[in-house]
Amino acid sequence: APLDGVPFHAAGPLKRWLLASDELAPGAGVFIALHEFSDVPPEERAYCRPHRHDHDEINVFHTTSRLEVEVLLGEEKVVVEAPATVLIPAGTPHAANVRSGSGVMVAILLDGRYRATDGAGPGKSRKSAGTSIPARER
């Protein structure tokens, strides 16, 4: 199902689909959204504001060509080149914004509903955030 009106995310420059949630399948226990990026213009790349969740989130980035995304994890920014996976522990302020290219991100929130709060401040994560190779610090 198309997914619009996600808190802390601007309407453009991508297409979003809701793949799984407690609303679609009661008791699913996960919220899975597919984000499709296609050569996003520079003025629309910062579409996601820092936010946090009370549950862990996993972001999987994939492309058939090239996709580079800047990911904020707490106070650290990393540049992720697809294919890559990012673990975002509960309570960690985070945001993901396209730098260049085209591809998809599958956001898997380990909660059946999308719930987020403002990501200002350092957060209260109990675990370490992490990225898979390939990634490089900005």
Where are these regions (language model features)?
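Conserved metal-binding segment of the jelly-roll/cupin
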Residues: V80-S100
